[in-house]
Amino acid sequence: MADLLSVLQDKLSGKNVKIVLPEGEDERVLIAATQLQKTDYVSPIVLGNEDNIKSLASKHALDLTQIEIIDPATSELKDELVDAFVERRKGKATKEQAVELLDNVNYFGTMLVYTGKAEGLVSGAAHSTGDTVRPALQIIKTKPGVSRTSGIFFMIKGDEQYIFGDCAINPELDAQGLAEIAVESAKSAQSFGMDPKVAMLSFSTKGSAKSDDVTKVQEALKLAQEKAEADQLDHVVIDGEFQFDAAIVPSVAEKKAPGAKIQGDANVFVFPSLEAGNIGYKIAQRLGGYDAVGPVLQGLNSPVNDLSRGCSTEDVYNLSIITAAQALQ
């Protein structure tokens, strides 16, 4: 983790990227905000009831003098953001509905990003993934040419660094969806300084098993390779389908997939379903001892990232750094 953060911190030095932390009444978030404020990487904007935040700060002896605190219920920005929301959701939300929605810290924070008052958002310490992602999908929306957002995790232990996806967002994926996630994950890997070798995972290696699920991954591989070529991702390798051991162990790859472009040296893993991805990253985290940073959402016009409700202060800090780095891309 230290290597990734040090690379990102070098890129962020002096940038003071404005990142919204909507859950300012959560002590983990507030402590992380004070730590971030001491850097020149991130300038946090904390949302919540100001009295509650100040009481929490007093309890933990935190200095808030340099931190911007906004209470959505009383903010002078509320009317401006309501009007912008109604315009963005034209025909889908009345002004009265917008006023009510923007009392919600995640909607308010997402509108700060959409209107350019902030550059990214990190939430989820006290909210579900849906509560964090829904406003982003409605307001910020996906990039041109991208039909969905997806969630990747950086899996880090010592010098080892991998990307797992999709582990958080899409419960049902067809071949086209898997292909899109593979290409977006490759782009994410590149943007964080990795040389992407993307393995499309299955319970089959290079046709060793036959089923509709295997066929879906094989079709996704072909589509992903075509999309990568169309997007001119010249230095990206995408191959499959692989069982996990064939994707990560050279001696196994030599036996199961001789001649494959990836010979046990994959660093980006695209799981065939959300169940597999979510279970896989948690096994690596809990049994393998890997730090799991994320989910980092990809495919949006501006970065919005989702914490686990079991996150630590360190997780909030780290994901804020990653979000700031995304904002500069």
UniProtKB/Swiss-Prot annotation:
Subcellular location per the Swiss-Prot or TrEMBL entry: Cytoplasm
Ribosomal protein as UniProt keyword: no
InterPro entries: P_Ac_Bu_trans (IPR012147), P_AcTrfase (IPR004614), P_AcTrfase_dom1 (IPR042113), P_AcTrfase_dom2 (IPR042112), Phos_Acetyltrans/Butyryltrans (IPR050500), PTA_PTB (IPR002505)
Keywords per UniProt: Acyltransferase, Cytoplasm, Transferase
Main location: cytoplasm
Pathway: Metabolic intermediate biosynthesis; acetyl-CoA biosynthesis; acetyl-CoA from acetate: step 2/2
Listed transmembrane segments: none
Keyword Transferase annotated: yes
Catalytic reaction list: acetyl-CoA + phosphate = acetyl phosphate + CoA
A single BP term in Gene Ontology: acetyl-CoA biosynthetic process
One Gene Ontology term, aspect cellular component: cytoplasm
Residue runs in coiled coils: none
EC number: 2.3.1.8
SUPFAM superfamilies linked to this entry: Isocitrate/Isopropylmalate dehydrogenase-like
An MF annotation (GO) of this entry: phosphate acetyltransferase activity
Enzymatic class: transferase
One Pfam family matching this protein: PTA_PTB
Homology family: Belongs to the phosphate acetyltransferase and butyryltransferase family.
Protein name, UniProt field: Phosphate acetyltransferase
Organism of this sequence: Staphylococcus epidermidis (strain ATCC 12228 / FDA PCI 1200)
